[in-house]
Amino acid sequence: MQKRLAKIILGVFTLVGGVSGCAAAYEVFDSPSQPLPTLSNPPNSTVSQRSTTNEFAALEQSVHQQINKYRQSRNLPPLALDARISEQSRLHSQAMASGKVPFSHNGFEARVKAIGQSIPYGSAAENVAYNQGYSNPDQQAVEGWIKSPGHRKNMEGQFDVTGIGITKNAKGEYYFTQVFIKRR
């Protein structure tokens, strides 16, 4: 029952994210002139403090490989993984997992501007997901994105670099953020 509920929740949020959040992710932003502050975990956060452990690094690497495998199946070039983009993605996943921000694309423009401090970009997009109760949460997230037209559009976009951040909260919910960047 818990796995079925998790699948329903992922499906609902994937659909909602595809309808309400991803369209805005295709805006082209100018690189900022001033540095922006980055998000951090609030004190006493319910986010697992193991966000830099091997578990999350392995999940992030797996999502990257799955996305590139999907892109290859569509005759698209692979995306390079960038640690600076992954850091911004990870901070957003941590903020969602802790409840600091709702499950959403809130703050996307600020994340992209922060990335733009070190990576000049022409366009950017973002996918988010969350799930619980699966032995393969990374695969569930990617499959959900593939089934969602808005998320799939981001995966198939003319981007060349990406970052992925995954964390899990005390309830066992995994939160995923993937930012796509087209460098100038």
Identify the meaning behind each predicted range:
Residues 87-135:
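Short, surface-exposed glycine/acidic/tryptophan-bearing loops
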Residues 152-156:
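Short active-site loop/helix that positions an aromatic residue
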